[in-house]
Amino acid sequence: SETPFFYKDMKDFANRIVYYESSRGCPFRCGYCLSSIDKRVRLRDLALVKEELQFFLDQKVPQVKFIDRTFNCNHQHAMEIWSYIQEHDNGITNFHFEISADLLNGEELALLAKMRPGLVQLEIGVQSTNLQTLEAVRRHTNLDKLRHAVVRIHSEYNIHVHLDLIAGLPYEDMGSFIRSFNDVYSMRPQQLQLGFLKVLKGSYLEEMA
């Protein structure tokens, strides 16, 4: 809440993507990510978040891209924000969130199903479907729940879905990467984003290298 609001004068940001953070930190321990070093999650005050989102809505910003590491790691926080943008939709602004799909529960999926087409887009990090790889990088994903959530979201035809993969993770050879790619492609995302592993200084993977 003490972090100042950067976007008071929108002249310099006209027709641009606005980056916004409603939380810092991540409760998970993915070995390639520096956010895993500090597992605390600090949430911005919701009243302040709503005030700032309303400013973006009033300004008719084309897209607000949330840079929270795992937006839906706190159910109440996510529901409050998703409910607010659904109730105050201006018919123009799109909101982008990075989420863990296997954390989505029935209440969240039902709310997402009510969104105007184009109001929300979701970026979902799968990274790999190789269980040995996921264990090696300390990424605990329920792949069955993830797939079920993506299928449920697709069934409403209202949300643009990005699915992410990382090439170069431990125990991922060409054969297993092809399987991961095919697994993710079969979920029929609107966009499949491929990143390449960067061993970041201070990360768990650097320690293990």
Give, region by region, the residue ranges found by the protein language model.
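C-terminal EAL-domain catalytic cores of bacterial cyclic di-GMP phosphodiesterases
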Residues: 159-163
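Short, hinge-like loop/turn segments at secondary-structure boundaries
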Residues: 82-83, 180, 209
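Short, basic, helix/turn surface patches
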Residues: 1-4, 191-193
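Catalytic cores of alpha/beta
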Residues: 108-112, 170-186
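Conserved acidic functional residues
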Residues: 69, 164, 195
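Structural recognition of alpha->loop->beta junctions
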Residues: 114-120, 184-192
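Radical SAM [4Fe-4S] cluster-binding motif and immediate context
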Residues: 2-155
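Flexible glycine/acidic-rich beta-alpha junction loops that bind and position SAM and/or redox cofactors
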Residues: 28, 75-76, 132-137, 167-175, ...
